[in-house]
């Protein structure tokens, strides 16, 4: 049974209306010719009744009437006019008329802030305000700031262009404008952050030029980024800001009071002891972080307040609370304020005294807020009564046709608006005031005495470097105390490695093997300390962003922060050494002399500081953490290689000996060795005497040695000499001086890098790598000093709204396109009859039925928008027979018709979604009242008995205050929850969801997780390839993708890489791409989680306009959570589900035309909306706790919103619909028999192509790995160049192979960051049903092999031949060695992949990887030969994956080799003694047979092929764990 749609309108309903827009933002090629109303404005008044009647008739004819409050996005208008009056002539004609001031805007301050003059905050401000405070008078005249284009230095870009304005105390000025308009540049100019050489014009503060030395002390600059120390509490964050920026005279009690007042003001008192938090540390909410950002900006007090988007991410009530308090600060604290906002409500806008509208660096209006509407009305632009004036101000310059009641509009481009403003009375008045007050004080009541910062000669900082260092140290130790787990980790690691090394080298003897093992132990002790401090690279990057932010705001000098950072880092190193050093020292039986033990401990502490300083230097000089790790790892490897252990000094060629001397680890190793070996005697066990007692050696001299044996090394000095260490004992103290010089050098470089570099700024720039062929990128403005083409530039390319393009030329270009059939006639009302002041058009598909057209109205052809009409040439369209209509005006009569052109993917209908008694709860830990020390589990109810439905073609808005459960409900409906307790019923087309439901639904998440290396079109095409069924041909699929790109207005950027946030597409573009990716699956139901969050009104409108097209044009079911929607956006929705705190329904039903249904409902409850109030904001007040409404007798009574709704007629009607037959009898329900639309092989091919391109488009990673391989190959090859068959060459061959495998381990660490980044994309896509997880994993692994293998090949081939390794017969040894290296690189790549997949984050994966590589080095068989391992550690040796490639390559190399001692070089002299008399000296050559030499390491020739099997075994284990991790592990919960 069909039910009456609550949105059906009667004959008394207002006309369905839409403002027409010639918006170049939508490149839809839809040249339309509108009626010229120059002669018909008066006639339209007489036709209103006819229009109303026709409007009603059309509603009853299944939406034959195209009526959309936002149809201007789909149509572009073309105006023909002979009237070429200039803008100022039009203004002159209106001079005698009413000024157009609106009695409802701005809202009076007394109404917004009752009793604001006498509340507690105002009193406190007045009491604490210094008596002599006057604030800053800002005088800016003809200011222009020009920079050179980053790529083309000859091109100069004006970021601001000849702007003039003034600011004075006690007034707030609002800046509005689209991204790239110049807002940030003005803020930087007033904050003194721009370079004078690029600035032209006059800028005065209190009549004086800017003094860069101390100007910042007069201002408070609140940035839009919430950058704070995550481990500090809210109170500590405020106190630190006040300590740094506050006046020196403030006492401790005054500071406490100031901090408390600030927290109370911002509503943060209850959270004062909660840490701020970040992505890894749980803390306060995002809205609270924004309040903290505002608080630290204003806490010092200032004479000028600059705030850049301070309410971004906050709900409307919180935003108003904060800015109303700012208003009090400004009014009663005598500080002027300049503030920019994204989507301000009418209440927020009314708080401001003045308005500045910017567009592309030029002022389009500057004047009183209460005169702004009248100014634009005189120009022919009117703000509809139901619209927020702030939206009107933001959009009128970019979309003048939308608001013009004079056609064609005389201001068509921003240049026209600038010209109109320059010709207006406002500009003339401004110039007169500035001419009359050239002293820079534009005020009728000038103060007698003004603050002069230049005269006071204030310092740059309020406090000296000593005090700054003190408070930075205090903060640093607080951070350390909060990060106690880092201390515990280092302590645990120290104890673990101390016990490991101590027991592994348990009680080493002072014999020959003990002497060699001590060298290995000392080397590994050094390496352990070095790698422990190396984690500072990652941690320092986390701190660096906060430092850059606070340095820019002049919290402290770089030196103060730097000194405190060094001091605060010392305890952690000392603590680790305090546990690690004694354990390993005494267990391993190192020299039991107290002074040597003290030296050992001091040198380890010095080593820790050296490594820490080196790691910080690498982090400070590197733009990204990846580059820092590459630089640090390469240098570290080279320094360790030349430290004297792997390659002793005597074995290093003269061309590389300089690396031995500049390596700081050389001197650490020498210091440890000298301390351990000097003045120590060594002996031999019987088995260590040389030559061994073999029959050959027992023969009498000269055939043998006559049984004579010697102990090769009898003193520590002899052992050191074998390693090239010849310095005396006192030199170990010189080592401290050498290391101190290194530490100072590293810290000095780090200090200057921090002082003069700011890599975070450079990250925000984006160089456009590729545009569509033949697409010319025009020079754009940006609010960045470097003027690189940034995401703002991409916005302008995307918008294609070039100010310099001639308006009429564009119209002519559009006319030249192929004409399409005449299908629409437009009836234009007279502007005088419009209560809203905006042009309204009735668009009727029946050309023969023109309501009230009259004889003066011309019929014109209107081209059908390309995105609304079926394509003649394409077999697939995304179009529907129903036109785009405003949701609130739509009758929602859906059609399942198919395109006549064939398979019409986009015309398939949506699904009916219904939910009944839906509840959701989670288990949380709370304090146990019976035992305060324990926690108990308690169930927290987040959603309670939620009912509702959505039909195809409808848009349902989920709204409510923060914490009401909007996103929770969306996740439950989309079945994205991974935990919690869900009860109730969800029905899709009358049936419960199944495992195949992913085929018909799509979820656009709030965080736009997209593959960064794909282009826009590739991302959408990939989704289509994986998620469309095989019945769709390639041509059809490609056509479908092209249509999506067109509808989403992504054509101009479709060939650009997506990138990452801040270094790629803008937020708005990423949002539309995300929608396109989900739309490519041809879903029947589309879920969107806050798609407008973080966008300005223009971008938010674009996104929701696209969603509206999806719902109406494609007849889809759309459910969307929205946060602070504008009136224009709110109009798009058909239904509203409003939740209150606790997740309970307080309204579910239709919105109606211009929100008439819900506003009527509110009116019946005693809530009456005033003009210019956003209906969305007004409706949200239903959810206010303790809401008071007007009772029957005019009295104020409390409102129970939930009870009122369930007793209302709307509720009864909605439940009748839900309980009745919601789904029509003729509705066709699709059925599926597979979870995935495409086959495994199709998914695999698509994934292989994407993964391959992704790796190719990250050339920096691959090229850096290749360069590193080549450099290390040349370095190691020439270090061991053309090895011969002498004694030292035998050891050198083993060292070369061992170190080569260590370098292979770098592949594992280097791939972790990329894999973790890709993992987020995988989680989103596999949850959405893109593909099988096995298809992804297989493609990811296989496509990595060419890059991994090429890295290994580029290393081993040059190394092998330069070093002169044995190639064997027919180069068989070379090919075997190459094969071993290839599979070893694959094994390490699989190891890194396994850790990146199975561990929660990059930091932990890198840490575990480093520990794993360290342990593999220790047990691999080189540092300690297998025969020398304690029996308890044999299992570690056999489990070590490094053992097998090392054994395989070494046995391959040494098989069949014979070594000699030419000229007794390397031989051991054996005195021949007979009858107690030495008769001769005979030399013994220790290493003669390669196979025997391998046995000393425990390596066996017969194991070579078993080793290959073991390597493959590890590859399968790591890859298998990776498959399991991808399939089973999800490091996030919903």
Swiss-Prot record:
Spell out the SUPFAM superfamilies in the cross-references.
P-loop containing nucleoside triphosphate hydrolases
Residues that coordinate or bind ATP 1:
177-184
Ranges where the ABC transporter domain occurs = 138-385, 924-1166
User: For bias kind Acidic residues, which ranges apply?
Assistant: 797-808
Tell me the Gene Ontology biological-process terms attached to this UniProt entry. aggregation involved in sorocarp development; sorocarp morphogenesis
Classify the main location: membrane
Per UniProt, the ranges with Polar residues bias are: 830-841, 864-873
What residue intervals traverse the membrane?
486-506, 521-541, 566-586, 592-612, 625-645, 652-672, 734-754, 1261-1281, 1296-1316, 1345-1365, 1377-1397, 1404-1424, 1506-1526
Its GO CC terms are:
membrane
Topological category with respect to the lipid bilayer: Multi-pass membrane protein
Report the residue ranges that make up the ABC transmembrane type-2 domain in this protein. 481-757, 1256-1529
Please note every region of biased composition (Basic and acidic residues). 1-11, 897-906
Q: Binding of ATP 2: at which residues?
A: 960-967
Residues annotated as region Disordered? 1-85, 781-907
Q: Which domain of life is it from?
A: Eukaryota
Compartment annotation: Membrane
GO molecular function per UniProt: ABC-type transporter activity; ATP binding; ATP hydrolysis activity; ATPase-coupled transmembrane transporter activity
The record's section on InterPro entries has: AAA+_ATPase, ABC2_TM, ABC_transporter-like_ATP-bd, ABC_transporter-like_CS, ABCG_dom, ABCG_PDR_2, P-loop_NTPase, PDR_assoc
Locate the compositionally biased regions of type Low complexity.
Answer: 21-65, 842-856, 874-896
What keywords appear on the UniProt entry? ATP-binding, Membrane, Nucleotide-binding, Repeat, Transmembrane, Transmembrane helix, Transport
Family named by the database record: Belongs to the ABC transporter superfamily. ABCG family. PDR (TC 3.A.1.205) subfamily.
- Recorded protein name is ABC transporter G family member 6
